[in-house]
């Protein structure tokens, strides 16, 4: 209209009057906030998690209801800048409260939820959340993989899921190349309880460490970048990596009651845990899959990396060194208030499997042929009949190894127990740039088993 008016010759000038949403860039008054490039990067704008815009634009009405579990070596319980939940747990002894107040866990907790704008210390990503300390070590010494057992880690995740945690942060890894079924079963259980499980990618500078590398598909695996926007040299990478967050020179709380500067993917993961908390603090009814998709779909594509299409990655362009990119708190929370994506429907009603043919109703007809032996090996084949050729289907599973993609997914499994074994199998569907997911809890029931 403005162009038409100007070109008519009747007006000296014509310009549209734009409606602009103003946004404050006011930063919190915490003592060391100016050092927190991860929240506001003055030297390299855009290489941060866009915290200030998120903080100033949204109210987070449910923030005080969100519990974030820190599975670690304990959290110092008398730090002025931390708000701890009134339940903690020692997964090694089974004790409540934990009784361990480790330095590593205290540092992780500060990144997630240190109180913002209180005139002291630092600001956490999700100020106002309750931190649930869960210790998995024998002592509160610096966290080490030799200091616990896989059972302790699995019990820690289950405890968090059973006691109100919505987010479970795991800044630890194991020195093994094989998936750990005991921990994966606990993660699957937590997903079923409505929890997002976040893992650091590891600090070896090579492939993502276990158990993150072999974790169920709803897990978020986080690598680290520095203040220049480059992947940190120690950060784990590869096909299991989902996103990156700041992980070098991060200011946070420590076990002395003071503050310190740290580096590692251990401190990248809690940025994502904090943003997940902010999403649920805006809309606590969102599903695990919706929240995970929001995190991945709203990232910043930081420079120096070539992103491409991966048939197993349905939330946009992806890169093996930085995943979908740098997490973006403002964009993620903005996506909550927008309309939910409209994608192909796929629904399941399957919860338990007996020998024979089973079905999932949704796009066309999904037929599951299940065969297995008690205390032996078997094979599950998932296929879609009468499929829509304009739709991309991707199968994933907690059952190793992953094989195949598209319309048919086959996976081998083995069982050495007389008890039912629970697994997750998921079908992700992409059409017109939109994706949705549906999964089932697959219970492999040994022949002859009686309830």
Ranges and model annotations:
Residues 1-31, 59, 64, 186:
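Inhibitory N-terminal propeptides of secreted protease zymogens
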Residues 11, 28-175, 220, 228, ...:
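Active-site core segment of subtilase-fold serine proteases
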Residues 23, 82, 95-101, 119-123, ...:
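Substrate-binding/specificity loop regions of serine endopeptidase catalytic domains
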Residues 109-112, 132-138, 166-170, 233, ...:
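Hydrolase catalytic cores
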Residues 374-385:
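A short beta-strand segment in extracellular, disulfide-stabilized domains
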Residues 387-393:
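Solvent-exposed loop segments of extracellular immunoglobulin-like
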Residues 397-413:
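Surface-exposed, flexible coil segments in extracellular/virion-facing regions
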Residues 419-425:
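Exposed beta-strand face motif in extracellular beta-rich ectodomains
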